[in-house]
Every structure is written in C-alpha cells, then in structure tokens.
Amino acid sequence: MNFQRMIDAFDMFNSLNLAQGVTPYIHLEKRRPEGTDNLYGLLHAIKNRYQVKFSYEKYYESEVTKRTLNPYGLKEFRYRWYVLGKENGEGIVKTFALDRLKDLDVTQTKFAFPKDYNIEESFRHSFGIIGPNKPHPEEIILSFNAIQGKYIKSLALHHDQEILVN
C-alpha cells in the first residue's frame, strides 16, 4: 500500500468519524478479506527476516501442502492479500494468497533478504499478482465506446495505461 492510499484511507476514516449520524446514508462493501488474521505474524516475520511455515491449499488442487518460506513482503490486490517470498531451495519468488494460508508458524530461523529484490519493481509490469513471463511487456490496445471510456479514464485498469484517442 503506498503512502497516498494510506493518507486517503485516513482522511476517509476521519471524515466518517466526525460526521455523526451519517451511518444510515453510507453503504460500504461488506466483504472483508480472508486471511488478514495472519498479517501481524507475517509482518513480524518480514521485518525480522524470520522464515515462516504454513499449510497451503490451491484452488485447483485438492491436496494441502506444507510450505517453508522466506517472506519478502505483502501485496494487496482487489481485497485479497498475498505474501511474497522464496521457498527453501527454490529460485523464484512466489505469491501465496493469505485466505488459503493456514497454521502459520513464525520460526526463529533467520534468512538473508536479497539486496537486489524490489517488490515495487517486480510488479511494475504486472496486473495484480500476475506478471509477464517475458522480459518486457507487450503493448496492448483496447477500445471502448464513449460511455465505457469514461469509466476507464476515471479508474485505470493499469498504472501504465495511456489514452490514445479521447
């Protein structure tokens, strides 16, 4: 979460707190991301460079697997939280959805954070948690009718989005 989003959330919280009696007039989305109960433990592990162990269930596999991870950071995308890191012996950074992560154990085993890893940079060309499988992204041109175009202009699909024809 970047600093501006934190400030925006704080401003919204303060506005709602100060405006007494407005609850009947405001309807917020009721969904709460699953797995947020592990945020504190994961943040503690990331900050202190502790390995974590957990059980993980993929949606497309019925078997629950045991994982050991060197956690590098957290990412939020569309009300879902993910932990990023490398598993023991693996060479690539993987993402694990917190809503499918169970039995979190923050170990006392330390790991070295790679000096060349940058979370922001690793997701620069991605959409959510899905990154390109090529070194450079491809250019994609989308076309919308005038009404849908207004929505796309007001809430970009991607931070690199450009408007070619207005």
Language-model regions, residue ranges each:
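Loop-centered beta-sheet repeat module
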Residues: 43-87
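Generic structural signal for residues positioned in beta-strands
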Residues: 24-25, 53, 73, 100-103, ...
